[in-house]
Amino acid sequence: MKIKSFLLIILFFIISKIHISFADEAKMTKGFEIFNETAACAACHVLKAAGSEGNIGPNLDTVAGLNYDSVMDIVTHGLGVMPAFGEDEILTKEEIDIVSFYVANSAGK
């Protein structure tokens, strides 16, 4: 009985991991679309994973300390000449979350 319970717990964790990776993959795909089309980040930024070659904003592949929280803050509130996509209601909170996840997991890759 203990072995059966143990195997069920292991199976549950394996299935949970698979579901999480599918969710992350879907989020990355949607993030790519937002980066390249909806928000047009690619027009200004270099990001190898997105195939973008913008030359106005910083190269996101070389920015030190780029993580989800920092990207989320910059996209929401803007920085320098970059618009505040959240404050100006250019993107929804969900879109900002998705594109921030995408950039944080793509930069430097």
Predicted regions and their residues:
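N-terminal export/targeting leaders of redox proteins
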Residues: 1-26, 108-109
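Extended, non-globular alpha-helical segments
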Residues: 1-3, 75-81, 90
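His/Cys-centered metal/cofactor-coordination and adjacent catalytic loops
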Residues: 22, 37, 54
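Sequence/structural segment immediately N-terminal to covalent heme-attachment motifs in c-type
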Residues: 25-48
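Sec-exported extracytoplasmic/periplasmic mature domains
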Residues: 36, 40, 65, 76-80, ...
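Gly/Gly-Pro-rich "capping" loops immediately C-terminal to redox-active cysteine motifs
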Residues: 42-76, 81
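C-terminal capping alpha-helices of c-type cytochrome domains
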Residues: 88-109
